[in-house]
């Protein structure tokens, strides 16, 4: 197994998975400051492959709204928004999300992800994505997971 489910959740986490070097967690609103810091620090790095956001997106108050939506969508089984936290430092270094979750006969979803610029090419996203995909197959019983990747994004193409 590439992950274990941690029942000793902290900081208002709704779900937490541990891998060898990472913690993947659905974070609550009290983490808005740390999430905002991650997004601000990586704004220009993510710009080429991310959707466009205005300046208000990169504020703590706006992130609290997004986190509230994430948590509600997670509770309803519509979204699994896993923030990637480096266990050694406690830093938020990325995110893997599963969305467009279809149940019934379909049992599929899509995934998207991003990583902190300083943590690229170190195997963190490979570790996170392998564990998160295994979790979705095991716990959500997905049959298929599609990755939304722009053809110009060579790193993501190599990852999947």
Segments (PLM) and residue ranges:
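Acyl-donor (CoA/ACP) binding surface of acyl/acetyltransferases
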Residues: 1-34, 38-48, 81-160
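Generic, well-ordered alpha-helical segments
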Residues: 27, 38, 55-62, 76
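Conserved GNAT-fold acetyl-CoA-binding loop/helix
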Residues: 47-68
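A short helix-loop-beta-strand connector motif used in the catalytic cores of GNAT acetyltransferases and
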Residues: 55-56, 68-83
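Short alpha-helix boundary/capping motifs
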Residues: 62-64, 74, 139
């Amino acid at each position: 197994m590439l992950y274990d489910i941690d029942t000793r959740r902290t900081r208002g986490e709704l779900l937490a998975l541990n891998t060898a070097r990472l913690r993947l967690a659905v974070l609550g609103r009290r983490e808005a400051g740390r999430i905002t810091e991650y997004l601000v620090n990586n704004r220009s790095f993510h710009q080429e492959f991310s959707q466009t956001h205005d300046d208000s997106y990169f504020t703590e108050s706006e992130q609290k709204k997004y986190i509230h939506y994430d948590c509600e969508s997670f509770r309803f089984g519509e979204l699994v928004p896993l923030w990637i936290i480096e266990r050694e430092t406690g830093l938020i270094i990325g995110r893997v999300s599963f969305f467009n979750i279809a149940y019934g006969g379909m049992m599929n979803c899509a995934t998207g992800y991003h990583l902190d610029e300083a943590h690229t090419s170190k195997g963190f996203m490979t570790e996170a994505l392998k564990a998160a995909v295994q979790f979705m197959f095991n716990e959500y019983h997905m049959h298929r997971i599609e990755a939304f990747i722009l053809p110009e994004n060579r790193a993501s193409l190599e990852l999947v």
